[in-house]
């Protein structure tokens, strides 16, 4: 079923007919945009916390059409042709791209300007991580979003997108996740990353057939994570 759904949402992502928000609204409904607005009003930037559920890249297009100045933070794909196609798609609709781990100063500048970053944390990659719980098992989870939020005061706004039974897209934006700040930096990194992971798990549980189960999410063992 995942493969069939992937074909359905890929056709939406690759649509060349998108010219405006009204075009997007023909097949995509946004829920909770007011939560982004409330977080953005604080003036310290917004980190969209999201995951590889559904047509996840369409979220950046949606927010760009809503007037949000957004950069997607991610790791390049191994296939250069597919990577170029994806970047062209993002740029065409107003979102920019920042390679994970290559320009941290730019990430901070974007947040200080009051702009938004979109960061996916549901994959086990070779970046700074902490072991936290995910579906009852220890999982190496990237801490970039956690560190940025703790250092800059940016609001962390969770979101995800999914395809319903009628093949309509639905993007859900939720209230800001409050950060824990006890003064113990390492403990706070772990606690906040766990809170973020809890949201991701909830999103995946809502639509498990639309998550990227082919990824080796639990491949890194405790003590092997990049620190």
Place the predicted regions along the sequence by residue:
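Catalytic core of membrane glycerolipid acyltransferases/transacylases, capturing the structured
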Residues: 42-101, 113, 127-130
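Short amphipathic alpha-helical segments and helix-helix/interface helices
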Residues: 36-37, 60, 86-87, 107-108, ...
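A conditional alpha-helix N-cap/helix-loop micro-motif detector
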Residues: 28-30, 79, 97-100, 138-139, ...
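Single conserved hydrophobic/aromatic residue that forms the stacking wall/gate
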Residues: 1-13
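Short, flexible loop segments at the rims of nucleotide/cofactor-binding pockets, characterized by
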Residues: 22-28, 75, 92-98, 135-136, ...
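Non-catalytic C-terminal accessory region of glycerolipid acyltransferases
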Residues: 40, 65, 101-227
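Membrane-anchoring hydrophobic helices of lipid-metabolizing enzymes
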Residues: 10-50, 86, 94
């Amino acid at each position: 079923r995942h493969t069939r759904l992937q074909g359905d949402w890929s056709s939406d992502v690759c649509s060349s007919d998108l010219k405006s928000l009204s075009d997007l609204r023909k097949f995509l409904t946004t829920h909770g945009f007011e939560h982004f607005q409330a977080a953005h009003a604080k003036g310290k930037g917004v980190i969209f916390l999201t995951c590889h559920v559904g047509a996840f890249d369409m979220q950046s297009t949606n927010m760009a059409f809503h007037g949000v100045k957004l950069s997607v933070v991610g790791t390049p794909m191994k296939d250069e042709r597919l990577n170029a196609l994806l970047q062209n798609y993002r740029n065409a609709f107003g979102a920019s791209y920042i390679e994970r781990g290559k320009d941290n100063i730019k990430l901070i500048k974007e947040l200080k300007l009051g702009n938004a970053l979109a960061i996916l944390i549901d994959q086990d990659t070779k970046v700074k991580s902490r072991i936290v719980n995910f579906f009852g098992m220890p999982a190496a989870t990237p801490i970039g979003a956690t560190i940025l939020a703790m250092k800059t005061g940016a609001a962390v706004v969770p979101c995800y997108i999914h395809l319903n039974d009628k093949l309509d897209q639905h993007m859900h934006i939720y209230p800001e996740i409050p950060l824990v700040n006890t003064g113990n930096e390492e403990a706070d990194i772990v606690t906040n990353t766990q809170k973020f992971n809890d949201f991701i798990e909830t999103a995946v549980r809502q639509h498990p057939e639309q998550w990227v189960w082919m990824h080796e999410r639990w491949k890194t063992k405790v003590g092997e994570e990049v620190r």
